[in-house]
Amino acid sequence: MRELSIAYGRSSSAKLWKNSATTWDDLCAKLKTTVRTRETAAEYKAMTKTEKAAVKDKGGFVGGYLKDGRRLVQNVEYRSFLTLDADKAQPGFIDRFVRECEYAAVIYTTHGHTPDAPRVRIILPFEENITPDCYAAVARYFTAVWGIDQFDECSYRINQLMYWPTTPSDG
């Protein structure tokens, strides 16, 4: 499989992001490993939005190339893969996706995921890089197939970061 462009940031607030290349297999391997954090799922649920952001921010990535290493809308030259945020996934969504998705994909749970309230990230590689103008349309088409109401609006932002997988201590 071809090399995919990816930009890494040490945190969501990083000013400079490192452009790199990865293979699909290497990206999938990286996403299999979660960082265990100290708090329990119940403690995480009780945190403020700011506290939650700090706990789960162990760095992240953008699925494409960033001009000058800046994660600004106008600096995204192209995207190599689709990154979707299913924060309102229905129970059974994960099993259905794994069973029915006909494309190469990786799905991983978010820090706030629970069996009763599934929250997942879905990553799909493109056969070739796509332009920023095409990205939102492709993302909206894909989410419409799976139930657009289950996906957060950030899924359509060309410069949206995805956090690396993190999990509460008892998650």
Model-derived regions, located:
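Signature for HUH/AEP ssDNA processing cores
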Residues: 1-118, 125-137
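Short, conserved secondary-structure transition motifs
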Residues: 115, 125-130, 151-171
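Generic beta-strand structural signal
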Residues: 103, 120, 160-162
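Hydrophobic, well-ordered secondary-structure segments
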Residues: 135-139, 143, 161
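Low-complexity, flexible helical/coil segments
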Residues: 118-121, 142
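A common structural junction motif
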Residues: 101-106, 140-150
